[in-house]
């Protein structure tokens, strides 16, 4: 499992979200793929107006600003024993 961070070059909020995510102990070791919303029209239409957008396991975690509580919930949900 990995995080997907929809972003664009020069986006200060995106850089803040990435740095904040890296600082969360529970998120350490979880890969983060940064996706430039401007490389694909469909992606730009879907996410371009609300970047940064953070997903985990295909589900929205937060957008605009990092929500540490939502990151914690997403990780806990997917790390539960089955």
Predicted features along the sequence, with ranges:
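Local sequence-structure signature of Cys/Sec-based thiol-disulfide redox active-site neighborhoods
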Residues: 1-23
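Generic recognition of short, well-ordered alpha-helical segments
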Residues: 16-19, 46, 66
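Conserved segment of the thioredoxin-like fold in thiol-based oxidoreductases
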Residues: 19-25, 29-30, 48-50
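Thiol-based oxidoreductase modules, predominantly thioredoxin-like and allied folds used
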Residues: 30-41
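Short Fe-S-cluster ligation motifs
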Residues: 40-52
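A short, hydrophobic beta-strand/beta-hairpin element that forms part of a small beta-sheet core
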Residues: 52-60
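Non-catalytic, surface beta->alpha helical segment in thiol-disulfide oxidoreductase systems
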Residues: 59-82
């Amino acid at each position: 499992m990995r995080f997907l961070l929809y972003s664009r070059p020069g986006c200060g909020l995106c850089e803040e979200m990435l740095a904040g995510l890296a600082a969360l102990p529970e998120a350490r070791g979880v890969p983060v793929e940064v996706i430039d919303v401007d490389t694909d029209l469909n992606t730009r239409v879907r996410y371009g107006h609300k970047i940064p957008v953070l997903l985990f396991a295909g589900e929205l975690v937060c957008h605009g600003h990092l929500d540490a509580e939502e990151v914690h919930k997403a990780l806990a949900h997917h790390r539960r024993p089955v």
